[in-house]
């Protein structure tokens, strides 16, 4: 196996230092405390919304309450249509042991058949809405992401893993299959053969192998000493994820949205790229970039 490129956590240059309180809420969510929220200033204007899953007693398993809360946050961002104050989204955990353990099987055991069908429909729609957001989205994972937890991470555009991460789709070992997008989002990301290996065996994949497979975009080194300190790995991966979001948000908001559209439509080739290019070439941001280049200064983008 080729050696993974490891990103060592660095200071957030040119931006406010972000203090992350370990094992503590980062503000109160309007949608309930199963998700804690922080808004980080983005370069120029707007903010990066950080959502921290917070069900420590259930390893962030997806309950009705958690799904409702997550869905409302995603709906809020979707309503902005890429033109609001939310420049990027980082999805992370407020729990050391797990990013997300998938479905809440204890709660699921109480469901009727109709309850299960309704829950799955809501889960799939929420994940689809996340997948379709018109802003950069990042999952920050430093621990376990299994089953629906990995399927959730597959819905974001980018993923930052710690070297301590363990991910997988173990459903076939439970006599079912991934049911929230894993069977098509995973092969779309890493290819059919590699996806079949993970899905058919149900095996767990380390952070290093996930990077090798193309499952994550960044791999953050967590030392044994850091791993032994509560919150250290989680904080380190979250910082790298926020830094990535800040770096991305240095770009023009319209250009970022059009780039996402173009890459999402890559199978159409030049047609998708040309359509997206027409959406940026005559914008105020584009003219500001040209002017700033001539004047040897940093551009000030307005999202227009």
Question: Residues of each region from the PLM?
Answer:
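Conserved CoA-thioester-binding segment of acyl-CoA-metabolizing enzymes
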Residues: 2-92, 128
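C-terminal long alpha-helix characteristic of the crotonase
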Residues: 44, 160-165, 216-272, 278, ...
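Glycine- (often His-adjacent) and acidic-residue-rich active-site loop
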Residues: 85-86, 92-128, 145, 175
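Short helix- or helix-capping micro-motifs
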Residues: 101-103, 186, 194-203
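Glycine-rich beta-to-alpha active-site loop
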Residues: 126-174, 204
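Acidic, divalent-metal-coordinating active-site segment for phosphoryl/phosphodiester hydrolysis
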Residues: 203-209
